[in-house]
Swiss-Prot record:
This is GMP synthase [glutamine-hydrolyzing]. Residues 195-384 form the GMPS ATP-PPase domain. Residues 4-194 form the Glutamine amidotransferase type-1 domain. Homodimer. The lineage of its organism: Bacteria, Bacillati, Bacillota, Clostridia, Eubacteriales. The gene is guaA. The active site is at 81 (nucleophile), 168, 170.
Amino acid sequence: MRDLVLVVDFGGQYNQLIARRVRECGVYCEIIPYTYSIEKIKEKNPKGIIFTGGPNSVYGENTPTLDKEIFNLNVPVLGICYGDQLMAHLLGGKVDTAPVREYGKTNVTLDNSSKLFAGIEADETCWMSHTDYIAEAPEGFKIIAHTDVCPVAAMENEERRLYGVQFHPEVEHTPFGQNMMRNFLYNICGLENSWSMASFAEEKIAEIKKIVGDKKLICALSGGVDSSVAAVMVHKAVGKQLTCIFVDHGLLRKDEGDQVEKIFKEGFDMNLIRVNAQDRFLGKLKGVSDPETKRKIIGEEFIRVFEEEAGKLGDIKFLVQGTIYPDVVESGTDTSAVIKSHHNVGGLPEDMEFSLIEPLRELFKDEVRAVGEELGIPHHLVWRQPFPGPGLAIRVLGEVTEDKLEVVREADAIFREEIALAGLESEIWQYFAVLPNIQSVGVMGDERTYCHTVGLRAVTSSDGMTSNWAHIPYEVIDKVSRRIVNEVKGVNRIVYDVTSKPPATIEWE
């Protein structure tokens, strides 16, 4: 059984980032709600516990708290921000409203004789975000960091292995944060760098073999990262017992359907059924302009097509799904099981009698990509950009027609090709063309034109939650613009979206 660190969620915005930082140290961790009972925590047998930040005050009404017994488990605890204040409050320290609030980059003085700050400079920069502060540390605790306005920026009870920091070590703005995290995990908890994607894949493949036996499985394959990695992992475990159903709704990017079929059918020798359903989907979308209605129609039609194809395959016992850890955390479900009864996951019908195989439900997105590379999936597929489930239907504003799809598909292909030629693929989080349902007057040759406008969208981001518009060199934008106007029939104007998120979303619909 692998060693485990528990991250107790108190509602902070960086909670998943804390878990990712722990995993980056080669240590497995899980996020649990603060309502988890002491009995459940004992059953998990953690080697370390981390309290996250949160938006509350320890003195507020109905504020998140937990049983003080957690400090008597002889397990090292690290409290971060609110978690630090809660530790102080529960153990008899004094928490109060800070006379001066601290937000953003802050100079901090560290006592690097502490195990927590071993090997770190005494004068550092950290990221603060708090309105309350610890005015007095609990009895038995030593102050090991301070700022000009925060007398207890970090504290420790070395004997009980209890540590608290007011700042956020998990964010990039705290440069020493990951070194501090390693000190806590390795030197204080006694853990080792043993959690790797190679070992995870090996364990999971063996587990799937044991669960499935000689039964048959199906997988709804979209060509996206999550479903692709899940399908390949299960295929490596059970081979031809798995059949993948690829519903080609005609809303994919240029040549994408053919690429998916080639990679998985030929490259991995999978049983793959490709359902060419473009006419069926476009028929359902005829006359529909509202984006939410488009999404709903596409989702419902996908279910129907998938159900019809699954029904032709006979006795199927398992459904493979590419659920990943953020989905699990956000739904508040337990993370321990690789298999559970199917219950309308992903909108699939209630009466589909499958058990669910979710081989990636313990992994974050970056870990899924790493596993994909371990499994031999082509780099360009593992690192493909996010692509919405409804596909190009939400990049064609207004009614979706075959002609409009062809325009946005060709424009998008040119944009992606030129970004690749400019060597900018790894610098831009997402980039695509959109057809905003605008026509404008132009002149081509000596004739007046009245044609489509194509919008180009490119953003930089680390997680997609917020983003900035990408400052692509003018010469690249110029070349893209000229190529689209000259090579894509029915386009006479190109615009570039220079809006960040927020206020805009990345997609236009």
